[in-house]
Amino acid sequence: MYLVVGLGNPGKQYEATRHNMGFDTVDRLVEDYNVPQGGVKFNAMYGKTMIGGEKVILMKPLSFMNLSGGPVREMANYFKIDPESELIVIYDDIDLEPGQLRIRKQGSAGGHNGIKDIIRQLGTEKFLRIKVCLLYTSDAADEL
C-alpha cells in the first residue's frame, strides 16, 4: 500500500496557485481514477483506490503546508505505511523551471517548510518526493 500526499494550503485564496501544486496533482489523480472520498481523518482528506495493481491512499492535509507533518505521520501510522518505501509526497519547488519535475528518494528539506515538518514528524529524510513546477494558466489542470 502507498500513501500519496499532495502538499498545499487550504482556502480559496490559495486555489490555482503554484504553492498548491501538490493538492492539484492529488485532485487530478482523484478525478482520473474516480476515487471515492474516504472522508476526513487526522486533519486530512483522503480516498483509497487501486493504481497499477497497488492499493493507494491519496491524501491532502487540511493543515497549512508548514504543519503537514502531523497529519502525514498520523495517517502513515494508522495505515501502517513505511515512509521509507511506501510514502510519496508531491509539492511545488520554486527552484524548478515551469514544466519541470524532479524526483528524489531522500534528502534534506531544501528550504521547504512543509517537507521540513514531515521530516521532523517522521524522524527520517528517507521518503520519495516528487517536486513539480507548472505554469499556472486556465489550462493548468491539463498539464498535470
Where are these regions (language model features)?
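Nucleotide and nucleotide-moiety/phosphate-recognizing core
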Residues: Y2-K105, K116, R120, T124-K131
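Phosphate- and other anionic-substrate recognition elements at nucleic-acid/protein interfaces
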Residues: A109
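Single conserved hydrophobic/aromatic residue that forms the stacking wall/gate
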Residues: Y136-L144
